[in-house]
Amino acid sequence: MKHIAILKQPFFNMVLSGEKTIESRWSVNKIAPYQKIKVGDELFIKQTGKPVTVKAKVKNVKFYELNTSLAENIKTQYGKQIGIDKLKNWQEISKKKYCSLIWLGDVQEIEPIEVPRSNGNGWIILK
């Protein structure tokens, strides 16, 4: 399956530089990519308001139903690879109910691909 992840700065550049190797998605409801992405899937990555310019292969995934201590454990164990230190709203994020962790492999820049607007969604599943 193919997916598009929409990232803000500085996270987009962190993926390109290799500093960010895990994409995390935190939500109140079970929304994509929670339980919708798997190892081997192709992930296209775009910066907010711009075309897709990066693709990656999904190396690993983990899904969590959260509580406060589990969110803190994720922060401690994977925070550096996620780039949690760049988040301005960790207290709000740590109160979410679900977390998807997606390990990125074979990250490469590609020719720009225009995609339709996401209507505020940060994740799109391609059919």
Map each language-model feature to its residues.
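A structural signal for short, well-ordered beta-strand segments and their strand-loop junctions
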Residues: 6, 44-45, 53, 103
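Short, basic/aromatic beta-hairpin or loop at an interaction surface
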Residues: 7-25
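Short beta-strand-centered aromatic/proline hotspots
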Residues: 52-61
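Short coil-to-beta transition motif at edge beta-strands of beta-rich domains
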Residues: 34-44
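Contiguous surface segments at macromolecular interaction interfaces
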Residues: 26-34, 50, 64-127
